[in-house]
Amino acid sequence: MKELKLIPPNDPRVQTAIAPYTDDMLKEHDFKDRKELTEAMFTCMNKFHGIGLTCNQVGLPFNMFVAGGHPSIDGGKAIAMYNPMIISSSVENLMMKEGCLTYPFLFLNIKRPRKCVFKYEDSEGKLQEAHLDGMMSRICQHEYDHILGRNFVEHVSKFKLKRAQDKAIKEIERLKRYKEQNNQA
């Protein structure tokens, strides 16, 4: 199986909207079918302890994301969406803290609709509809933003982003010191 790697947040592919997916795109990127791509995406997401991952986060031009798989989210339900589209969302919004594999240690309070309905193709190419609520809804909306070329840092003011970035830098420095201290023992 092909190993996928996260690309840095300043890579233009992370900030570029992705064209619709077609199966003939797979071969030029060394995947034999949707199932192999889906498996590679879940493997990469799990390697970095994520709960969602979009193809452009690993440098692939596929309109596809994977989400879930964590036991505390919808009972561990995992989903892969090809060519997803939000067809409706609730009026009720929730403010929650979000993170992103593209921006390690950065957490931001983001307001999103509590519920949404996605239309998408599954790993077998069949058209599906998912009525999502709560955390799974939030994850899929976050990943859908990536497909549109938007990142979660765009949902907050520059002041809030700077404050969160400073906090992330402190956390990274704290972890480095911890690692150095434990390696010396």
Predicted regions span which residues?
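Positively charged
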Residues: M1-A185
